[in-house]
Amino acid sequence: MLCLGWIFLWLVAGERIKGFNISGCSTKKLLWTYSTRSEEEFVLFCDLPEPQKSHFCHRNRLSPKQVPEHLPFMGSNDLSDVQWYQQPSNGDPLEDIRKSYPHIIQDKCTLHFLTPGVNNSGSYICRPKMIKSPYDVACCVKMILEVKPQTNASCEYSASHKQDLLLGSTGSISCPSLSCQSDAQSPAVTWYKNGKLLSVERSNRIVVDEVYDYHQGTYVCDYTQSDTVSSWTVRAVVQVRTIVGDTKLKPDILDPVEDTLEVELGKPLTISCKARFGFERVFNPVIKWYIKDSDLEWEVSVPEAKSIKSTLKDEIIERNIILEKVTQRDLRRKFVCFVQNSIGNTTQSVQLKEKRGVVLLYILLGTIGTLVAVLAASALLYRHWIEIVLLYRTYQSKDQTLGDKKDFDAFVSYAKWSSFPSEATSSLSEEHLALSLFPDVLENKYGYSLCLLERDVAPGGVYAEDIVSIIKRSRRGIFILSPNYVNGPSIFELQAAVNLALDDQTLKLILIKFCYFQEPESLPHLVKKALRVLPTVTWRGLKSVPPNSRFWAKMRYHMPVKNSQGFTWNQLRITSRIFQWKGLSRTETTGRSSQPKEW
């Protein structure tokens, strides 16, 4: 329903426009005589008759001595809401100005004609947009505008439609259409400034004793001409600006200031030239870019200059030169900014150089990156050093056991009896580690030959000299440390091995910390020192049982390098030697104790 209501109102409004009777409108004739040598504008005011104006604007009448504050419609909110039409010469319905004439602009109740031409001639009607009462139907103004070019060429010094006033001095504003007539011949003139009536001024010139900023604006001068048949109003529009005196200085370049500019090779670059030009009435600024290479110099085609700031006294103009990519060749050139006005010219050259900070930054970042990489690699190397060494041994190292005249890769020593409660379960005791896990991993998996007294020596025990002999014939000594071990007779084996290692550089000792223990005061000084300096591998219970655990990797790291492919033959050879040594031992032990001697 709302849409239907709007459509109905639009149709009614359209019928009113089509059937709009302009016979009741007040009529005013205007003449616009324009010069073909200059650009000028023209304005029409919607000047309603006084009775209708007071009804439409709801304003109080002024006494004859009072001067209206504003030109009709310019100061009234109601009068700003008017509609302009043009009446075609062929009698067609009225045309909306806003839709059909782009060179005509409506500003409140004023029509601005931007370009002169005889095609602007015609009848223009203005009326209120909102018709609130039957009286408003006849509230309209019809203006008959005649436009023709100026034909009087006898006036050589006619006033311009654009006039300047010098600030701080005296000046005058002349009506262009009457500038060639003397004051005695000139008719009475009505002046308007920015839509306000200047009631005091009636001559063809406005004399200004001292020019200020507020004298700038749009002035309109009207006077009446008549003949025996009719009379009309001649109107001219003057654009007045207040200016300062022409500059006496050359333009100065604000940017670039320095004669060198650091750049990055391979990157795009924009060099800006900003220049400040002093005011000139005839303002023709010049700003260009040149390139100087050795003895050659040429102008560069760059984008158009643009004004970035304009004041009463000066204007700042900018023009840029754009390089898609900075090359080594550009570093050998000079880029010259050239600016000029009517007084003189100024130049500023710029030499490009490679940015040192970027190079240093790259070096610094590269150094830091290298340092971080080295630290990370060092940490990784430290963490996996054992695995790396073992991998290297597998493929590169030669067998260290060849030709050393030793029968065992390692002699294993552990506590054979227990006087302290074990911290481990029976399945993970020292004996289980020595007699079960060591053979399974070191012998069966990696091919090392071990000497285990409980396994490889015939029952009945061995003497101290026999243990020393076995250690001498071993490349490594493995000692499983525990409270039972350091407080029991097995510590003799460690002491003997330490003494032998001092003389035999091929004998290496490996300590296994099976569980926590305290060193007894009775330990020999040499053993105490050995506990601190010898390599120690910590047993971590069930975590160390798998053959691929770090415990076994550390054990292999300390074991001699051995070619595992030939371990079967070596084991057979070593086993036969052990049995030969056992038989010899039985025949030579008559009358000797089976217990190790006191140390």
Curated annotation (Swiss-Prot):
Domain remark from Swiss-Prot or TrEMBL: The TIR domain mediates NAD(+) hydrolase (NADase) activity. Self-association of TIR domains is required for NADase activity.
Entry annotation: catalytic residues: E493
Consequence when changing Y212A: Abolishes binding to the preformed binary complex of IL18 and IL18R1. Impairs IL18 receptor signaling via NF-kappa-B
Enzyme class: hydrolase
Ranges that cross the membrane: 357-377
Domain TIR, residue spans: 406-559
Topology within the bilayer: Single-pass type I membrane protein
Name of protein: Interleukin-18 receptor accessory protein
Keyword Transmembrane helix set for record: yes
Assembly notes: Forms a ternary complex with IL18 and IL18R1. Within this complex, IL18R1 is involved in ligand-binding and IL18RAP in signaling leading to NF-kappa-B and JNK activation.
Family: Belongs to the interleukin-1 receptor family.
Distribution of this protein across tissues and organs: Detected in adrenal gland, bone marrow, brain, fetal brain, fetal liver, heart, kidney, lung, liver, peripheral blood leukocytes, placenta, prostate, salivary gland, skeletal muscle, spinal cord, testis, thymus, thyroid, trachea and uterus. Strongly expressed in peripheral blood leukocytes and spleen and, to a lesser extent, in colon. Specifically coexpressed with IL18R1 in T-helper 1 (Th1)cells.
Role this protein plays: Within the IL18 receptor complex, does not mediate IL18-binding, but involved in IL18-dependent signal transduction, leading to NF-kappa-B and JNK activation. May play a role in IL18-mediated IFNG synthesis from T-helper 1 (Th1) cells.
Cytoplasmic topological intervals: 378-599
Reaction(s) catalysed by this chain's protein: NAD(+) + H2O = ADP-D-ribose + nicotinamide + H(+)
Signal peptide residue numbers: 1-19
Residues bearing glycans: N21, N119, N152, N345
Domain Ig-like C2-type stretches: 149-235, 251-353
Compartment annotation: Cell membrane
